[in-house]
């Protein structure tokens, strides 16, 4: 549940004219160079090969031993890294963003960090402090690219809470939150006050060491939020695993309370809702109503969800009831219901309610654009769209050329850090990668058209 006061965007004219269904037929590929299309086709086909995704880290290690680090790195930069990553330096990121904005797309920068540190060194406060520095730099970079190439009011970036606090602590807090007597001790107001004052909460459910880590985590979150607000950058908080999401929602709600100001506009922090969970529509409706009753703005990033396999394996391991939708069709119905709920709230409550339709599904995009027109929601208003860099360009480009606000999620960083991150994200998004067959077909069609010299 995330709330802040006042609108993010000014009032603008609603969508005019008759609604025309967008054509996701690859027609907008004329904006891309042939080399970019060829790389996209090659990489997407590789990523749709299950063994490569499953054993990606092993393949990377094998290629380094066989080819050497330099040649292996060059091949990765020319393929997977170049397709999905903006670059390593600030200049490379700026160049990538400039290319995107030239074709009607906006950046949503992301620091590639792992939510489950896999070594003792990465569980220390020093590792989280290093992530804090990276997040603060991401805020600065998000503002810099907006100032250079686009409207600063639309600056957004992704924030992964478990880059700044331990997943184990979040799991402990989540378990406590779900107990009847735990809810009174763990109130967002208490955490928000601790963020501001710096005083240790001394929660009874945590050990001394855990309380100290919680206080340090609150301080880190507060610093990122304050800096983002000062730079006019909005924070979109990533969803994570169900067993830690209650704690993440608590932390985000506390964070939003610290950002509430009558002198600034809009939802500074947006939470992510995963449609593949059975209770998402109910939670979304409850949170939206609570925000409205409190007179606060409400920001939502709506996704289908990327942790299905892990969620089900954890459920089976602990003998718990499956919290996920039974199949993709049920998830799509859930997404459609949540989308309709949020679009109606945007229509009824104007700039106090904001939504990112984060989806690669063409039918969901069509539903959103049709309902925006029917409800009179302006194209440059409180509803925007989001897709991953290097994927779903036939949808992103069509939306951007039609005048919608479209963001590409853009990781950046050095090869050694980003490749393991990309492989793990690919493992989480197997269904998306394997479902990109239509995009591959459109890319192939466009490449053949160019090779044969045919007109579009």
From Swiss-Prot:
GO process terms (BP): proline catabolic process to glutamate
The molecular function terms in GO held by this entry are: FAD binding; oxidoreductase activity, acting on the CH-NH group of donors; proline dehydrogenase activity
Q: Which domain of life is it from?
A: Eukaryota
Q: What family, per the record?
A: Belongs to the proline oxidase family.
This protein's name: Hydroxyproline dehydrogenase
Q: What does this protein do?
A: Dehydrogenase that converts trans-4-L-hydroxyproline to delta-1-pyrroline-3-hydroxy-5-carboxylate (Hyp) using ubiquinone-10 as the terminal electron acceptor. Can also use proline as a substrate but with a very much lower efficiency. Does not react with other diastereomers of Hyp: trans-4-D-hydroxyproline and cis-4-L-hydroxyproline. Ubiquininone analogs such as menadione, duroquinone and ubiquinone-1 react more efficiently than oxygen as the terminal electron acceptor during catalysis.
Entry-annotated residues carrying N6-acetyllysine: 310, 320
Task: Give GO cellular component annotations, separated by semicolons.
Answer: mitochondrion
State the organism of origin. Answer: Rattus norvegicus
* InterPro entries hit by this protein: FAD-linked_oxidoreductase-like, Proline_DH_dom, Proline_oxidase
Q: Tell me its EC number(s), please.
A: 1.5.5.3, 1.5.5.2
Identify the cofactor(s): FAD
Keywords assigned by UniProt, alphabetized: Acetylation, FAD, Flavoprotein, Oxidoreductase, Proline metabolism
Catalytic activity annotation: trans-4-hydroxy-L-proline + a quinone = (3R,5S)-1-pyrroline-3-hydroxy-5-carboxylate + a quinol + H(+); L-proline + a quinone = (S)-1-pyrroline-5-carboxylate + a quinol + H(+)
